[in-house]
Amino acid sequence: MVQKVFSLIMIISLTFAGENRSDDLAYQLVLEKINKKVVPTSYIDEIFNNPSIEKHLEIPERFAKPYEKKSWEQYKKLFIKESRIVAGVKFYSENKDLVFQVSKKYDVDPFIILSIAGIESNYGRHYKGFTVFNSLYTQIHEMPKRAKWASNELASYLEYCYKDNVDPQSIEGSYAGAFGFGQFIPSSFNRYSVDFDDDGVRRPHDWPDVLGSIANYLVKNGYNPGSKNYAEGGDIWKSVWAYNHSDNYVMAVLGLAEKIRERSSYLHSDVENRLKYVIENFNPLNNRSVSELQRTLNANGYELEVDGRLGEKTINALRDAQSKKD
């Protein structure tokens, strides 16, 4: 008797689940758009029965306040600031060989690649907030104007998850549905991501694959290998614009790249000799010379505000650098 009751409950549960799926706009749209030669319907049914599926009502609110609608001055303060420049130089210092391997293979400016990684995820520090599935699911149900786009992306995402045996609820990304340290949307990930380290898997959170994928994206979207044309409307500008359709974004990428390039010239500088040079050539010390010292220290792992003032933090950093040298 107990077994019969249990069986009846299971039948009722499955029936309601089927009815819920048939009433689920996201399920219907994905079923229409997904390549069933690649992904079986049974897999889609299983995924849409996951109890972790939910709609996040704060996502439409986030879309109402995108970074790209900010003025250039506001945008610049967000993305070309001292902390991000320092983080970029530090990342470059720690991953220099990898950066140049990627740059050499694709013949793309290494500092453009670094800059995009910095703006997209602050070098892996900021890249998630919602599961990719739930973000796209929410857009389909709560944002009618984005339903078509989001359903295409959700179909692409499930194709990736099925092929690579990834739990669709296991990857978190942005409110828009981009994921990984390079913040690719699913269709772009499927199209442009590469297995740069040849381990057999394209990994959105492993730096070899991330940097390689960014470089590949740029080249596939108009970056002429070896180009030095950074002018507005040139091939580099257009390829970065393809990554994010915003002039502010392009200017931020180019601006941050130049700051990291400039600051990286101080890497591994001899702090003792530079201090000696400044003291001998600038008496008394002026803002320009102290700023140069602060940049040198930042390039070697310190985090100072470049304000041209020889304050306590700068002096302590100099002492620490000197003690390490001794």
Question: What is each stretch, according to the model?
Answer:
Residues V38-L285, D307-R309:
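Catalytic glycan-binding domains that act on GlcNAc-containing polysaccharides
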Residues F282-V290, R295-D326:
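Short acidic, glycine/serine/threonine-rich helix-capping segments at coil-helix boundaries
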Residues G18-A26:
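Cleaved targeting-peptide boundary
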Residues D23, N95, T314:
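Hydrophobic (often cysteine-bearing) scaffold residues that line and stabilize catalytic clefts
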Residues L25-A26, E94, R288-E292:
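Alpha-helix N-cap/N′ positions at the starts of helices
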Residues V30-L31, V99, I185, Q294:
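Generic structural marker for isolated residues within well-ordered, non-membrane alpha-helices
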Residues K4-L14:
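Sec-dependent N-terminal signal peptides
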